[in-house]
A protein has these predicted regions:
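Short gly/pro/ser/thr-enriched loop/turn and capping motifs at secondary-structure boundaries
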Residues: 31-32, 84
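Surface loop/turn motifs at the tips and blade-to-blade linkers of beta-strand repeat domains
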Residues: 2-5, 55-57
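Beta-propeller and closely related beta-sheet repeat lectin domains
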Residues: 10-13, 62-65, 112
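Beta-rich accessory regions
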Residues: 39-51, 55-59, 68-237
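Short, conserved beta-strand/loop elements in beta-sheet-dominated catalytic cores
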Residues: 23, 65-70
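Hydrophobic core segments of beta-strands in well-ordered, beta-rich domains
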Residues: 1-4, 10-15, 19-27, 73-82
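Short, solvent-exposed loop/turn segments at conserved positions within beta-propeller repeat blades
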Residues: 27-30, 105
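Beta-propeller blade termini and top-face loops
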Residues: 32-38
Length: 237
């Protein structure tokens, strides 16, 4: 497979779902997926337009690797680079440079299970085994959100958060994550008009060297206006 849009195609994963071939690769930016079949020449012939597999790239999800379990079960981990936290300048004080982050380090993402849906596109969900790690559960009754801040009864550093929102076509919602008394917060924002799901990191830390640029991905809203989110929070990256 060749793609003139990229000068680098690395860390390829070729998955076979019957006769359908799924190629996942890392082009030194957001991870991409291409779907088709292997032709008589041994090349991948696409059956649909390619698209971004994960919008994190070097800022959160790169160089994923996939293993196959029995019954065509594909499980994937991605690299969450430590450098995504930000870099300490070379001319910074020694104490700061000694505590700097390194591009080659990081952690692995939570494992994902990959399947094909009826339209032939790739479905990506956290593996169900993660549910065994759940502890205390908090449930919030259905409520109507207004423009003012609605506090959620959640505290902690390891949280699995699931929510469903019925949105108007021009609505925008924001979820403030890890709010602190000193003003730190990370915002998960969704704009129904632009279908943009965005992680806003401008105020994530008081550390001036922390990465602050937003991460975003297009996420079309369902025709009935339903937005469903499942968010895993911790302090690993």
């Amino acid at each position: 497979y060749e793609d003139p849009a990229y000068s680098i195609i690395e860390c390829p994963n070729l998955l076979m779902f019957g006769d359908t071939a799924v190629l996942i690769f890392s082009p030194n930016e957001e991870v991409q997926v291409r779907i088709g079949h292997i032709g008589d020449t041994g090349r991948l012939e696409l059956s649909m337009s390619g698209y971004t597999f994960d919008g994190g790239g070097w800022q959160g999800y790169y160089a994923p690797q996939t293993l196959k379990r029995k019954a065509d079960r594909f499980i994937q981990w991605g690299w969450m680079p430590e450098g995504a936290r930000g870099q300490v300048p070379e001319d910074a004080p020694l104490a700061e440079r000694e505590a700097r982050t390194f591009d080659w380090a990081g952690v692995l993402s939570i494992p994902r299970e990959l399947t094909l849906d009826a339209s032939g596109r790739l479905n990506i969900v956290p593996i169900p085994e993660l549910e065994a790690l759940r502890g205390e559960q908090v449930q919030m009754a259905e409520t109507t959100l207004v423009q003012d801040l609605t506090a959620l009864p959640l505290k902690g550093l390891q949280i699995e958060f699931m929510a469903a929102f019925h949105l108007d076509p021009d609505a925008r919602i924001e979820i403030s994550i890890f709010r602190s008394r000193t003003g730190e917060e990370t915002i998960l924002r969704y704009d129904a008009g632009s279908c943009l799901l965005e992680l806003v990191r401008a105020s994530s830390s008081l550390d001036p060297h922390t990465a602050r640029e937003p991460l975003s991905v297009l996420h079309p809203l369902a025709t009935d206006g339903l937005l469903q989110l499942r968010v895993f929070l911790d302090v690993s990256t």
